[in-house]
Regions:
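Juxtamembrane/interface and other helix-to-disorder boundary residues
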Residues: 1-130, 142, 146-153, 158-160, ...
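Glycine- and acidic
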Residues: 133-134
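Conserved glycine-centered beta-strand/turn positions repeated across beta-sheet architectures
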Residues: 137-138, 142, 162-166
Length: 446
């Protein structure tokens, strides 16, 4: 772990920004885990990444996996000894687990809710309480804060782990009120379809274009079911990019290199499924933000101009605004705040730093490879730590936190690589993971 702390749900927001969005796909690293920014870039450029290639270090997972119980007390089982003495009924408390939150933490969380009555009106609080296992009545009380904290510590422990602070903010809410692509089972179902209709049919599909079209067709089925306009498939100019969403033209870009070759390994297929699903979650996010702005009365032209999306997509959002005061509207508001609202300047700084840190790390790595002196090793260590901190901050952006938590479910549906080509001799080695797993496309990061 890098030691870089994730900001609280109530963390500081910067002043009004210029909008940015997109994603630079990162390489798979140790033990086959993908890591690196799936960022969103400026509306001036594609949401996808392209640029320099570099081996990635193992990236730390940031987050707080807190204890899962406030207090445990068990009664010693009663036993009758052979001597016939009365059973021992002494109550022996076990050592108390570390509390999820102390009194000050509970007070901060209660203040977080009560200071934002427009975000947490009674209707939202009622649904939130029910979602975390409480009686709907009660409003903001200690029980709500502790129940949210407990939910964060258990249900929110998957990477990227949620901070356990009792605040159901823009990172926690999308997981509590799952919808669309992060609904339980949806990602695994998509991954299973990728396995049967793309990976198992690798030789039949034959070309990168055919494989890309089938991939995007499959993920579009999920988007359509969620009420999100489908994307168009296109080749990414960066051939090794395994997926990126360009919201300015509503296109999913996948590089030919990521889908080329006569075979694909399970690792490489899982990376593609994960990345495409992650990017499709960004598609869903951007349409929800458009629907949120529609619910506030913006015209289709206004939505298109503000978000930088096609007018045709904005018209669809305008025709289907989110219900005001609903959990989904509150979730979309959190994403909008991060990308276009009060958090946008902070987001710009985070994306700029992860790009700069990656380039500095690459330069330090090259210097060390050419001259592995103690000084160059120290410089490489420092540059790597800087990149890990920057990546933690990037992954903590609300929209990225959500997408990074959503994508891995698709990878779980991949169970094998493609069948060997029919003309492959017996005992042929499996295909390599491809250059996408060693590449860090960064060019489109702002």
């Amino acid at each position: 772990m890098s030691g870089a702390a994730i900001a609280r749900e109530s963390g500081p927001e910067a002043s009004r920004p210029r909008p940015t969005t997109g994603r630079a796909a990162l390489a798979r690293i140790t033990r086959g885990e993908r890591s690196g920014p799936g960022t969103t870039t400026s509306p001036r450029s594609s949401a996808g990444g392209s640029g320099s290639s570099a081996q990635l270090p193992r990236l730390a997972l940031a987050g707080n996996r807190a204890v899962t119980a406030l207090l445990t007390v068990s009664r010693q089982e009663e036993t009758t000894e052979a001597t016939g003495t009365a059973p021992d009924t002494t109550v022996t408390p076990e050592p108390a687990a570390t509390p999820l939150l102390d009194a000050a933490g509970i007070a901060r969380a209660r203040q977080y809710y009560t200071a934002q009555p427009d975000r947490y009106p009674p209707a939202i609080l009622t649904q939130l309480r029910s979602a975390v296992g409480l009686a709907p009545e009660g409003g903001v009380d200690d029980a709500l804060v502790l129940a949210v904290a407990r939910w964060q510590s258990i249900e929110g422990a998957a990477s990227p782990a949620l901070v356990v602070d009792g605040m159901a903010g823009p990172r926690t809410l999308p997981r509590i009120f799952a919808s669309g692509l992060n609904t339980a089972g949806e990602g695994e179902s998509f991954g299973g379809d990728v396995q049967s209709e793309v990976v198992d049919e690798w030789a039949t599909l034959a070309t990168p274009a055919a494989r890309r079209d089938r991939l995007v067709e499959l993920v579009n089925q999920r988007l359509t079911a969620a009420g999100v306009p489908p994307m168009t498939a296109a080749a990414d100019p960066n051939p090794v990019n395994s997926g990126s969403f360009d919201f300015t033209v509503w296109v999913m870009l996948v590089g030919d290199g990521a889908l080329g070759g006569g075979e694909i390994t399970q690792e490489a297929a899982a990376d593609v499924a994960d990345t495409v699903y992650h990017e499709a979650r960004h598609t869903e996010q951007w349409f929800r933000m458009a629907q949120y702005r529609a619910s506030q009365g913006l015209s289709a032209a206004g939505i298109a101009a503000e978000l930088g999306i096609p007018v045709a997509i904005a018209r669809l959002a305008r025709a289907a605004p989110l219900a005001a005061g609903s959990p989904l509207a509150l979730i979309a508001r959190g994403w909008w705040d991060s990308v276009y609202g009060g958090g946008a300047e902070h987001r710009e700084r985070v994306l700029a730093e992860v790009d700069a840190a990656a380039r500095a790390r690459d330069a330090a790595r090259a210097a060390h490879a050419g001259d592995p002196t103690p000084a160059n090793q120290a410089a490489l260590d420092a540059a790597t730590e800087r990149f890990e901190r920057a990546h933690d901050a990037y992954q903590n952006l609300p929209e990225e936190n959500d997408a990074w938590a959503t994508g891995p479910a698709a990878a779980a549906g991949i169970t094998s690589g493609s069948p060997p080509p029919t003309d492959a001799p017996a005992g042929s080695p499996p295909a390599s993971g491809g250059p996408a797993h060693d590449a860090l496309p960064e060019e489109n990061l702002p």
